[in-house]
């Protein structure tokens, strides 16, 4: 079973450029296929995906009465009697009415997929699909629509794809950046020799039909460096490459399980030798080509899975003598490997890369057994030495759900959930990239719920992916945007743990340090104009016709009735990046026998009439908790002052808005250091103390083929930390001048064959002469002759006894490959 990428979805990647994909389901499962395609997140700044109700029942329902159109209202989220300040957005009803655009789609289709083509182009593609599985065959029909004004108007361009049925499981493959490229994968008859695609390189103004020499298994993968280069896997496990945007294809290798683009148009892939990907799992070979298939190099064997994150290449490798796996890391595209200092995992465990950038890696290591939790480790800047960051991290094995979230609106901030000893779920937050985790502060305008033992002391707990997977009344995951500094919006409950009661919506304007209840009950929400506007729609099973918006980061709210005839709401869509002023509301209307898709696009440009000026911004110190402290705001070695829009200013940031910040370096303190391997921080203490089980044990590890010895008093600098001077704990890595090998078997060693008998005899003679000296050296430097692997295994046993357990969950299938070969719920999630 393929497990999705962790909610870290945090420092993750989206090689296909901008494109938010919505799949809106209309008919029940008995009538329609339930295919759903979720677009993967973009690099380093994951964008939220709409997650709305699916399988809406078909039948006769009375629409709620609409009132006069249009109309509006306002209220303040704080105490009663303060509503006067909310009247500053004047004449907003008339302004929005003049900028509300309705489009009725003249056909009934089972699902709708929506994607943006390019950044700030205004081009949107909408694919409607009607899919009915019959006894002998499947009947399907598609329509394609295009808008070039952010969804205000649509044109039917189905004729450009020859009225062909498009396979929704492959989605719309959008090219990176502003390449304007689009690839649609068509359905073909069962007896066809290959698949069919439709290609556009002019933002979907025109399409070219191309018949493929293979049947695709995955969505076409664009090279991040050159959008003309495409990669695809076939249903027969062939690896195909196109150098001219899909015009011609060449099979460069057979028996391929997984393939990924690396940097500089490099391709990494795993291949099998004994029949199938599943049969050879754990015995796969990892190959690399840097010239699009002209030449190859085997860079790893005994591979279980591999993945890419930041500048790191990861491989989950089977051990020599048992069925355990270990993570190996390379920073030179597989030329040399080092074993990560992480616990090995067994067949029922997994590793998962939660987040990775060029500085560090967050790695989840699964606990043995189906516990549903594991341990988060954070790496050094080489991805080799890891420190324990968080125990009992929630990561289910059944559905692969984790709440790990990168708060992109403030550096160093991550939110996730832990499974406590009493099996309740609690939210934790870190502001220093995993150095220390704490509970979220209780919102000032909220009371503790029934889960709280002390009604005066409790915390805010955030609903994320796990709550959504459990079908709680949570329509959206937490939302933050890099250009809306400090803003975080999320559903939550206030108590001792996450509650199953109906959640409310909370907002933080300082990156998660403090929170305020923003809206009663569950809502859909989105950010426009870099935080200048927040839009929300109530989550309801009844038809709706009202939206809410705020121009002061959720303090005051206005309501606007966008239609007199309520619609069954299915999705709220805005252009990725939060720079747009447009929002699209998707839904359908129902009568006795008919139903129609409808969209309403609202442009807020006239609400924010003027451009923001210097006076509209104020200086804000990020991570500020104690203004009296000289080091206030120091996180990861430096402070940052931002120019932020005043809440009282009603003006446009604009599409060209750039976040203005001023960094300043801080003196080093213990807060700038993680606990080294074998050390931990007691609760509410900044000092690292040695784990009792590891006292007296040396740490030696194999780095780039040489054995090294680590001397430490318990601290290592957080990767990316920029502090200077101040505290400087001793940490030394000493080269033992000894060659070493890890359990990652060198392919050259396995495959090498000698043709020269004299050379062999000479080498043997030399070895006999030097063997005594070698034994003496080993005894002198390796404590009585214990080899590195044994030495590490001893530390491993102590670490596991102390609860430092690991998993190898490297993602072995891309998010677009929902029909991959893996059905193992314990596969490694390396991306």
Swiss-Prot record:
> Which topology term describes how it sits in the membrane?
Single-pass type I membrane protein
Q: Where is this region: Intrachain binding of the propeptide and the extracellular domain?
A: 50-61
Task: Report where it is expressed, by tissue.
Answer: Expressed in brain and prostate (at protein level). Expressed at high levels in brain, spinal cord, heart, skeletal muscle, thyroid, placenta and testis. Expressed at lower levels in lymphoid organs, kidney, colon and liver.
**Intervals, Extracellular compartment:** 78-755
* UniProt modification remark: The N-terminal propeptide is cleaved by furin and possibly other homologous proteases. Palmitoylated. Undergoes cysteine S-palmitoylation which promotes the partitioning of the receptor into an endosomal membrane subdomain where it can interact with the retromer cargo-selective complex which mediates its retrograde trafficking to the Golgi apparatus.
Question: What highest taxon heads this organism's lineage?
Answer: Eukaryota
* Signal peptide positions (record): 1-33
**Where do we find S-palmitoyl cysteine lipid attachment?**
783
What induces its synthesis? Answer: During osteoblast differentiation.
Transmembrane stretches, by residue range?
756-778
Cystine pairings recorded for this chain? 86-556, 257-277, 448-458, 612-651, 634-666, 668-723, 675-688, 702-740
Q: Cite a single GO BP annotation.
A: endocytosis
SMART domains reported for this sequence: VPS10 (SM00602)
- Localisation: Golgi apparatus, Golgi stack membrane; Endosome membrane; Endoplasmic reticulum membrane; Nucleus membrane
- For the region Interactions with LRPAP1 and NGFB, give the residue spans: 612-756
| Short sequence motif DXXLL motif involved in the interaction with GGA1: positions | 826-830
Q: Name one GO cellular component term.
A: nuclear membrane
Q: Which residues are glycosylated?
A: 98, 162, 274, 406, 582, 684
Q: Where are the BNR repeats?
A: 145-156, 198-209, 240-251, 287-298, 328-339, 377-388, 428-439, 506-517, 548-559
Q: Which residues carry this modification: Phosphoserine?
A: 814, 819, 825
One term of GO molecular function: nerve growth factor binding
Oligomer and partners: Interacts with LPL and SLC2A4. Interacts with the cytosolic adapter proteins GGA1 and GGA2. Interacts with numerous ligands including the receptor-associated protein LRPAP1/RAP, GM2A and NTS. Forms a complex with NGFR which binds specifically to the precursor forms of NGFB (proNGFB) and BDNF (proBDNF). Interacts with the Trk receptors NTRK1, NTRK2 and NTRK3; may regulate their anterograde axonal transport and signaling. Interacts with CLN5. Interacts with PSAP.
Please provide the record's free-text comment about the domains of this protein: The N-terminal propeptide may facilitate precursor transport within the Golgi stack. Intrachain binding of the N-terminal propeptide and the extracellular domain may also inhibit premature ligand binding.
* Function recorded in the entry: Functions as a sorting receptor in the Golgi compartment and as a clearance receptor on the cell surface. Required for protein transport from the Golgi apparatus to the lysosomes by a pathway that is independent of the mannose-6-phosphate receptor (M6PR). Lysosomal proteins bind specifically to the receptor in the Golgi apparatus and the resulting receptor-ligand complex is transported to an acidic prelysosomal compartment where the low pH mediates the dissociation of the complex.
Question: What disorder is listed for this protein?
Answer: A common polymorphism located in a non-coding region between CELSR2 and PSRC1 alters a CEBP transcription factor binding site and is responsible for changes in hepatic expression of SORT1. Altered SORT1 expression in liver affects low density lipoprotein cholesterol levels in plasma and is associated with susceptibility to myocardial infarction.
- Write the protein's name: Sortilin
What is the protein's species of origin?
Answer: Homo sapiens (Human)
Please name the taxonomic classification of the source: Eukaryota, Metazoa, Chordata, Craniata, Vertebrata
């Amino acid at each position: 079973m393929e497990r999705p990428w962790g909610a870290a979805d945090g420092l993750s990647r989206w090689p296909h450029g901008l494109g938010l994909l919505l799949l809106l389901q209309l008919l029940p499962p008995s009538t329609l296929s339930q295919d759903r395609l979720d677009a993967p997140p973009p690099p380093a700044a994951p964008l939220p995906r709409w997650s709305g109700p699916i399988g809406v029942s078909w039948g006769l329902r009375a629409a709620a009465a609409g009132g006069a159109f249009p109309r509006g209202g306002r209220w303040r989220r704080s105490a009663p009697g303060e509503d006067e300040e909310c009247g500053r957005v004047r004449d907003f009803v008339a302004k929005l009415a003049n900028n509300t655009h309705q489009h009725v789609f003249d056909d009934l289709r089972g699902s709708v997929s929506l994607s943006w083509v390019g950044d700030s182009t205004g081009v949107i593609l909408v694919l409607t699909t009607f899919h009915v599985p019959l006894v002998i065959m499947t009947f399907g029909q598609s329509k394609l629509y295009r808008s070039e004004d952010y969804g205000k108007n649509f044109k039917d361009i189905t004729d450009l794809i020859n009225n062909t049925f498009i396979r929704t499981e492959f989605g719309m493959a959008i090219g990176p950046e502003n390449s304007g490229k689009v690839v649609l994968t068509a359905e073909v008859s069962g007896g066809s020799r290959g698949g069919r695609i439709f290609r556009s390189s002019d933002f979907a103004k025109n399409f070219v039909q191309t018949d493929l020499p293979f049947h695709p298994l995955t969505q076409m993968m664009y090279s991040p460096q050159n959008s003309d280069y495409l990669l695809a896997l076939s249903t027969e496990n062939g690896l195909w490459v196109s150098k001219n945007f899909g015009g011609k294809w060449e099979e460069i290798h057979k028996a391929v399980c997984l393939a990924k683009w690396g940097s500089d148009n490099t391709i990494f892939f795993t291949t099998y030798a004994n029949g199938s990907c599943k049969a050879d799992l754990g015995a796969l070979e990892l190959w690399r080509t840097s010239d699009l298939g002209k030449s190859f190099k085997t860079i790893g064997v005994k591979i279980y899975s591999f993945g890419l994150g930041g500048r790191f290449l990861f491989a989950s490798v089977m051990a020599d003598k048992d069925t355990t796996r270990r993570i190996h890391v390379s920073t030179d595209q597989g030329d040399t490997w080092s074993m990560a200092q992480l616990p090995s995992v067994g067949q029922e465990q997994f590793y998962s890369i939660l987040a990775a950038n060029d500085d560090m890696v967050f790695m989840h290591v699964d606990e043995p057994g189906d516990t549903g939790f594991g341990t988060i480790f954070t790496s050094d800047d080489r991805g080799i030495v890891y420190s324990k960051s968080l125990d009992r991290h929630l990561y289910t094995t059944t559905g692969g759900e984790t709440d790990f979230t990168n708060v992109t609106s403030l550096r160093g901030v991550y939110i996730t959930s832990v499974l406590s000893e009493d099996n309740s779920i609690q939210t934790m937050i870190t502001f220093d990239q995993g150095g220390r985790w704490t509970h979220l502060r209780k919102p000032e305008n909220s009371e503790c719920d029934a889960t709280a033992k002390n009604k005066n002391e409790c915390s805010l707990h955030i609903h994320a992916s796990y709550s959504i997977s459990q079908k709680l009344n949570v329509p959206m995951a937490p939302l933050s945007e890099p250009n809306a500094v400090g803003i975080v919006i999320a559903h939550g409950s206030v108590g001792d743990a996450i509650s199953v009661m109906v959640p409310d919506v909370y907002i933080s304007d300082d990156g998660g340090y403090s929170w305020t209840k923003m809206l009663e009950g569950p809502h859909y929400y989105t950010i426009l104009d870099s935080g200048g506007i927040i839009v929300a729609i109530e989550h309801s099973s009844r038809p709706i016709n009202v939206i809410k918006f705020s121009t002061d980061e959720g303090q005051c709210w206005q309501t606007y009735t966008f239609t007199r005839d309520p619609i069954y709401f299915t999705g709220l869509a805005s252009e990725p990046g939060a720079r747009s002023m447009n929002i699209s509301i998707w839904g359908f209307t129902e009568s006795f026998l008919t139903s129609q898709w409808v969209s309403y696009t609202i442009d807020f440009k006239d609400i924010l009439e003027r451009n923001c000026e210097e006076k509209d911004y104020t200086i804000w110190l990020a991570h500020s908790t104690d203004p009296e402290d000289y080091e206030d705001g120091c996180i990861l070695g430096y402070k940052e002052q931002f120019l932020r829009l005043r809440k009282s200013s009603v003006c446009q940031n604009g599409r060209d808005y750039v976040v203005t910040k001023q960094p300043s370096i801080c003196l080093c303190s213990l807060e700038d250091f993680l606990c080294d391997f074998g050390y931990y921080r007691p609760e509410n203490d900044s000092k690292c103390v040695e784990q009792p089980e590891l006292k007296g044990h040396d740490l030696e590890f194999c780095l780039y083929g040489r054995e090294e010895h680590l001397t430490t008093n318990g601290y290592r600098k957080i990767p990316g930390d920029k502090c200077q001077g101040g505290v400087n704990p001793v940490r030394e890595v000493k080269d033992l001048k000894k060659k070493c090998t890890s359990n990652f078997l060198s392919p050259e060693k396995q495959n090498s064959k000698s043709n020269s008998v004299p050379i062999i005899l000479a080498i043997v003679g030399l070895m006999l002469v030097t063997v005594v000296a070698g034994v003496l050296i080993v005894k002198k430097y390796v404590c009585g002759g214990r080899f590195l692997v044994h030495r590490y295994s001893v530390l491993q046993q102590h670490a596991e006894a102390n609860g430092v357990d690991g998993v190898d969950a490297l993602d072995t299938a891309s998010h677009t490959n929902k029909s991959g070969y893996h059905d193992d719920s314990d596969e490694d999630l390396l991306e």
